[in-house]
Amino acid sequence: MEKSIKGTRTEQNLLKSFAGESQARSRYTFFASQAKKEGYEQIAGVFMETAEQEKEHAKRFFKFLEGGMVEITASYPAGVIGNTMQNLAAAADGENEEWADLYPEFAKVAEEEGFKQIAVAFKMIATVEAEHEKRYRKLLANMEAGQVFEKDEAILWQCRNCGYVFEGKKAPQKCPACEHPQACLLYTSPSPRDGLLSR
């Protein structure tokens, strides 16, 4: 970066974003623990994976900062740890605010202040947050439809513990290979040739 961000709105926006991403990471780890308690290992895994991605976003924003103390005024979710459905809805709403409102505005300010690289970072991270929202909303829809462990057609279910793959409309109560509980099974694509895990 060529010019200093000290004293700019971009500096404040970076610190707000760093704080927001750091808090999201913590919330998602709390939500993962709750999902695991409720028997949703796959959803817990998605929360943990997303938490790690939020850490990387926080790191990206933090690295643009130049040190010292910066005072900011910002609002952050002061919510509770609900059940997994509530947590998915809250997470999706938070991701939506980031990609639809906050980061586009922060990118605009960065461009106006001459920080093109920072503007690009805000825009790129916003695209990731949009994907996070989609994933959370899909998981929530699956829960609402009672389709976390049961589908309308036969699909492949993979054990997160041992890798065993089972084909059927419903995940078995326990893995036939290692006997881990149903909570450890996640669905994969309906096509056996598609090795991508569905989200």
Which sequence ranges carry the predicted segments?
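Acidic/His metal-coordination segments adjacent to aromatic residues that form catalytic metal sites
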Residues: 2-13, 73-94
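Short cysteine-rich clusters marking metal-coordination/redox-active sites
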Residues: 159, 175-178
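Alpha-helical transition-metal enzyme core signature, strongest for iron centers
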Residues: 20-28, 47-62, 92-99, 122-136
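Conserved alpha-helical segments that form or flank metal/cofactor-binding pockets of metalloenzymes
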Residues: 37, 42-74, 135-143
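Short functional micro-motifs and their immediate structural scaffolds
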Residues: 167, 180-184
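Conserved small/polar residues in nucleotide/adenosyl-binding loops
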Residues: 187-192
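The feature marks the first
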Residues: 16-34, 38
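A broadly conserved sequence feature marking short terminus-proximal activation segments
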Residues: 105-165
